[in-house]
Amino acid sequence: MEEDEPMGGGESEPEQRKSGTPRLYIKELVMRNFKSYAGEQRVGPFHKSFSAVVGPNGSGKSNVIDAMLFVFGKRAKQMRLNKVSELIHNSTNHQNLDSAGVSVQFEEIIDLENGLYETVPGSDFMITRVAFRDNSSKYYINERSSNFTEVTKKLKGKGVDLDNNRFLILQGEVEQISLMKPKAQGPHDEGFLEYLEDIIGTNKYVEKIDELNKQLETLNESRSGVVQMVKLAEKERDNLEGLKDEAETYMLKELSHLKWQEKATKMAYEDTVAKITEQRDSLQNLENSLKDERVKMDESNEELKKFESVHEKHKKRQEVLDNELRACKEKFKEFERQDVKHREDLKHVKQKIKKLEDKLEKDSSKIGDMTKESEDSSNLIPKLQENIPKLQKVLLDEEKKLEEIKAIAKVETEGYRSELTKIRAELEPWEKDLIVHRGKLDVASSESELLSKKHEAALKAFTDAQKQLSDISTRKKEKAAATTSWKADIKKKKQEAIEARKVEEESLKEQETLVPQEQAAREKVAELKSAMNSEKSQNEVLKAVLRAKENNQIEGIYGRMGDLGAIDAKYDVAISTACAGLDYIVVETTSSAQACVELLRKGNLGFATFMILEKQTDHIHKLKEKVKTPEDVPRLFDLVRVKDERMKLAFYAALGNTVVAKDLDQATRIAYGGNREFRRVVALDGALFEKSGTMSGGGGKARGGRMGTSIRATGVSGEAVANAENELSKIVDMLNNIREKVGNAVRQYRAAENEVSGLEMELAKSQREIESLNSEHNYLEKQLASLEAASQPKTDEIDRLKELKKIISKEEKEIENLEKGSKQLKDKLQTNIENAGGEKLKGQKAKVEKIQTDIDKNNTEINRCNVQIETNQKLIKKLTKGIEEATREKERLEGEKENLHVTFKDITQKAFEIQETYKKTQQLIDEHKDVLTGAKSDYENLKKSVDELKASRVDAEFKVQDMKKKYNELEMREKGYKKKLNDLQIAFTKHMEQIQKDLVDPDKLQATLMDNNLNEACDLKRALEMVALLEAQLKELNPNLDSIAEYRSKVELYNGRVDELNSVTQERDDTRKQYDELRKRRLDEFMAGFNTISLKLKEMYQMITLGGDAELELVDSLDPFSEGVVFSVRPPKKSWKNIANLSGGEKTLSSLALVFALHHYKPTPLYVMDEIDAALDFKNVSIVGHYVKDRTKDAQFIIISLRNNMFELADRLVGIYKTDNCTKSITINPGSFAVCQKTPA
């Protein structure tokens, strides 16, 4: 088993004893295209103790250390390159590679006593870093992607010092140690001091110590400024001490004034309490009486509310019924309109049906007549045709007989007969033509007659329609006139209703206007009565003075100051609080005031304070001055309104430049601001700041009412009360008239609305009739055109008639010509023939002629019947078509008529129901009107009684108010005295506190408090005289009261500055303590490490040099950090020298001794050194090599060396060589070779 391999678990080997804790070591290094290493090259495995990397110069030995630096996260410049991408291998055979990577395999082991070791299971791990062409790189731990932070954290956790890199000694670093200065010369330099502090770890205190040092300097500067401020405050305090003493004298005088005020107020308070007791009894009796009246009033109000509720209930019910009745009317009107419309529609339909029935009957009759006539003609024609042969046969027989007769008279008649036969033969065509023309004449005459009758019938229908249109137009005009009249009436009645409602609304508005006036008038009467009674019971002092004024007993009296001015209600509380002089009596001269005082004294009426105007003339110029107030707040004086301009003097004397603030915050700012002229400030809520700085107000209800919003009248006369009562009476009469006017207007518009309702129903009915007439008129107008067209023969018919007339005329002329042409010949010959045969022949001829005539008639009749049949067939066809159309129209109208009957029935039923509802509603309204009238009467009567009770109660209340006012005045006076006593006591207490606070002379204070005059009994007058005397004395004094506050402020400022100085001093001391503690901790830790390292350095140097000496020395022994550390060395058999003055080899030995001492002070599991023996001779290399060999027992050393007496001591040799510009590696275990060499021996 090899020495560097872990101990196996075989049973044949004895159990090994562990000799240490786990430590980290580098097992193997794998490089891929890194610097001079092409492809994947494995360097190692390294020995757990001492591995030497050997190889010729330029082969790539130092790249092994660069590979480790690369994995440990060092930048390219630390590996003698500019960019990371330059780490990628680049040689002739390996160009344009994408990346370079290095993997370092670590493992934790536990050293055993016999040189073997045991691997800690699961402790191995591999760190890899790969560099790319884009100068980026990536980290991996066990092939898992990682980052620089995680890598460094893991290595630090295993004991590798990556912060100071003391485990790495690169090529040339040993010599750099010898070149170090005792201390860094700049922020980026490193000297021996910084080098040692990095190892010892005291450099962590440097930044904090520097920061505390800066804080300490800042605090010292701040403290110097505060010291100057304290001295300045002390000087200002001493300057104010004299003014303070003067103010203290004034304050003692003011203390005495407060005591006398307290005594006078107490006496006035006791007198007021006695008067209050007397007034309370009188008020109690009057309130009891008023309470009884209020009980009655409450009962009456309750009853009135009930009556009002009942009245309102009935009124609402009446409105509901009226609305229902109005709705019924509207519905009934609508049904009436529908009824009229349906009646007219039904009438119109019936007329149409009747006309159609008449037409059908007439046309049916015509068809019947024509059919019968055609049948008769059809039946007659066969008979006539049958008679003709018979008559012809008879004619032949008769002609034979005639021939026989003629034969007898043949001779005579032969000539005539021959001529007649000849004539007959000539006339036979004529006869035939005559028969034809007669037939044509008969046909044309019949057709002409039929056409004429048709035109006459159509003309008659057209004339009848025109007449109906005329009648309808007349009726429409009549209805339109009636409608216009009704509309005018409706408009008139509606206007009357509107005017009545307008009168009602205007009257109600007047009533609404007058009701408050009535109430105000009643209150005014009660107020005047109360004021008159109040004046009778006015304050006896003021009353006596005003009486003297009215009687001209004393001249120059104006009255109570509060009654001589007015102010907005907003400032009532403010002026009532801030102006104590509102109860003063204003007089013109001193003599007037003395006269008043004498009057009160003689009557033993009490005391009063007077404002003498002639004493206030020095304020006149101030009245005209324009002042600029702080924050533009108003002065109370400017807000007061007066009738007499002279009264402004009095108000200015009482108020001065007192200003009004909107709230306490603003008042505080102004009162304690820089403008002393406006130090007296009152807030709207009554908080008052005096010039002395004291504040009063708050804690209870704000006092107000000492000045009105209008200037009060001097008195109330009986005449004024009578005038107010007359005014009230007029308003009451006007109200009664207006209420009567409202009632009349209501009755008037209701009557007008009822008439409008009836007229609207008639108007609707008339409008429906007009609509029906319009409909019938429109129908007739539409028919009239067709009737007119029918009455006007058609062009073809006219042409036909003309043609028929021509035919008739022509045929008549032809017949006449034919008859004329044959008649003479026939008649002459016939006469001759007849005369020739005698009478017998004549008779026979007549008979023959008659038969011939009958035959001719039959032929004519047959022709006429045929024409008649043909004409009748045409007319029957036309009439049949008209009957069919008329029948269909009649059926439609019958359906419409039936629908109208159904709708009419429904309308009638609904209208009946509405009418019944209307009747019931009207009945309910009539019944309810009586109830409403009764309820209204009861309500108004009771309201009148309640109003009278209210007026009586108001009078009583005003009396109570007057008495209460007087009582309240006494109470207010009592409270005022009480409050004043409390205020005086508070002021006294505050004054005492202020005096004690200001350290006033105790003997003077005791003498003031024990004044014999204060303790002696006296009357109120004596006390007031003392108060007045002290006030006068105080006025004569003119101390700067602000000086006390300023002195106190300066004392407080001085104390505050002292406190601030103490605070700053304490903060500085705390910072200095922290600063000193950190410096001491740094010094102690540094010296402890320094001494340890120095001793180890001495030991290491003696061991390496075999007799030399070396030590670290402080340039400044008192402060090692001020000048730094020097490295002194005494080589063997030489004197002490600074390391910088040694030879190259001596510098290397000294530096290595220091490095080894530092390693001993802070050991790490790994040490990597690059040619540390380069400058040493053979002997010293051997000494260093054996020391390293000894140190590798508990640490891993990887040393690059070219000295055989160094690398021959190594446990493993890693050979580095280069071929084809590519570095390769081979690892050799020297121990194995040694075994092989021993085996043959």
Swiss-Prot record:
GO terms (BP aspect): cell division; embryo development ending in seed dormancy; meiotic cell cycle; mitotic chromosome condensation; mitotic sister chromatid segregation
The entry's keywords: Acetylation, ATP-binding, Cell cycle, Cell division, Coiled coil, DNA condensation, Meiosis, Mitosis, Nucleotide-binding, Nucleus
Coiled-coil features, chain-numbered ranges: 201-552, 719-1085
Modified residues (N-acetylmethionine): M1
Signal peptide: none
Domain Zinc-hook intervals: 25-1224
Pfam families with a match to the protein in the record: SMC_hinge, SMC_N
Comment, domains: The SMC hinge domain, which separates the large intramolecular coiled coil regions, allows the heterodimerization with a SMC2 subfamily member, forming a V-shaped heterodimer.
Protein name, as recorded: Structural maintenance of chromosomes protein 4
Organism (species): Arabidopsis thaliana (Mouse-ear cress)
Gene: SMC4
